[in-house]
């Protein structure tokens, strides 16, 4: 059994923290089997362009337990600050032509630098990894409450100047530039701040395969403080 391999880096001019863990789970195939038994699969709300269903609570518990010290070292967040986790099986299914403008640009999950997001790959490098971006006109690489309104206004100005974006972003554009890319790899976890601008690398020839064993199948997790 392979031991997990953890790498930490800081990306972009704002030096946002990024963690990558390879061989994260001892038996990842069990998650695929679990997913196939789930009956409630729905079109995702929000900006995710595909299908989602609940991942087992044990996945989130394992993540919090295994990475508690690493999260404190890399993100400066104590275990007491991250006691709640939501995890969802995720499968890209929305054709490029059906995307909204906000799905065609990098997004941030929440404007909260003290909350984290993770993507865990149950697919290989053929399905595209995750890229992190800088917004060219503002220089923002992460969106916080202090800059959110300014960022949204700048986006509207960009749309007027360059046109409304269409399709999946997968590399540099007039509005955004790539500051880091993490390729997909089976059993790889990527952990970053919820405020970081990012997007999956969905290429124009993506087949929208709805089979968890052969499509772009991942688990998305969101870590935050316990609810009051």
Give, region by region, the residue ranges found by the protein language model.
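Fe(II)/2-oxoglutarate oxygenase catalytic core
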Residues: 1-228
